[in-house]
């Protein structure tokens, strides 16, 4: 627990630095957007890909399969719980349900998993990320607009993160090990993930209207559902499963990440 709190404390300090950098004019809105794009399209895929540069074992492959299956289960739990507690009564019910179900598991989840569990954590997280994209661009789109086009769905699924998963998985199953210089290069790029993500998060936070957010009581309720109720429901179900605790914790962490936007 102390290690977790220490890692989270470090991340919050870097986030605070991002706020300061924006307030002092070192970051602006355009730079923040470019850094965010660089993070999502270059750094995150590098972290994901290099997480597969580990020695192949049947046990790891089976565990990865469990990670995919548990991720599907986690989303089904989230959808069910959200349908029960949020309902369709609010004018913004679709947005609220989308907010509770879909976390920012790439932006925040990868740095957390990488900081706490290293490559193993990111390795297991890739299962959740893949399932996230599948659900988000099908169920999520249908939830918001009532339908999902096949071409648009396929295009959206071909994100850099998913490409990183596919290439990494091919190398892992095919026992393809890159030269150490390339792995070190990917590792070096990936090491930017946590500090860059937190700096961007801080700069984004500095642009937000916090006063209006803090005075909207509905936001507190939805946040409680997203950050407490839903992760607790998933953790309760997972507590009965005799599986790798690191894998289970990584998926719970992904579920408990803040709201995603796309």
Regions found by a protein language model. Name each.
Residues 1-262:
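Alpha-helical transmembrane segments of multi-pass small-molecule/ion transporters
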């Amino acid at each position: 627990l102390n290690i977790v709190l220490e890692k989270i404390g470090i991340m919050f300090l870097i986030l605070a630095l991002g706020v300061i950098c924006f307030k002092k004019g070192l970051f602006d809105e355009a730079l923040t957007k470019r850094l965010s794009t660089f993070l999502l399209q270059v750094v995150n895929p590098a972290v994901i890909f290099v997480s597969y540069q580990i020695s192949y074992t049947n046990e790891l492959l089976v565990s990865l399969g469990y990670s995919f299956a548990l991720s599907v289960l986690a989303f089904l739990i989230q959808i069910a719980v959200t349908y029960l507690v949020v309902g369709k009564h609010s004018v913004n019910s679709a947005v609220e349900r989308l907010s509770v179900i879909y976390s920012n598991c790439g932006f925040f989840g990868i740095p957390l998993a990488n900081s706490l569990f290293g490559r193993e954590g990111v390795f297991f997280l890739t299962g959740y990320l893949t399932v996230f994209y599948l659900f988000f661009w099908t169920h999520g789109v249908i939830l918001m607009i009532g339908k999902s086009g096949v071409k648009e769905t396929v295009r959206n699924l071909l994100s850099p993160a998913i490409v990183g998963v596919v290439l990494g998985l091919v190398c892992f199953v095919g026992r393809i090990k890159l030269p150490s210089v390339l792995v070190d290069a990917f590792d070096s790029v990936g090491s930017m993930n946590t500090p860059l993500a937190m700096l961007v998060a801080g700069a984004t936070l500095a642009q937000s209207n916090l006063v209006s957010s803090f005075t909207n009581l509905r936001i507190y309720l939805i946040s409680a559902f997203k950050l407490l109720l839903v992760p607790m429901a998933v953790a309760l179900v997972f507590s009965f499963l005799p599986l790798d605790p690191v894998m289970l914790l990584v998926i719970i962490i992904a579920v408990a990440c803040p709201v995603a936007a796309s």
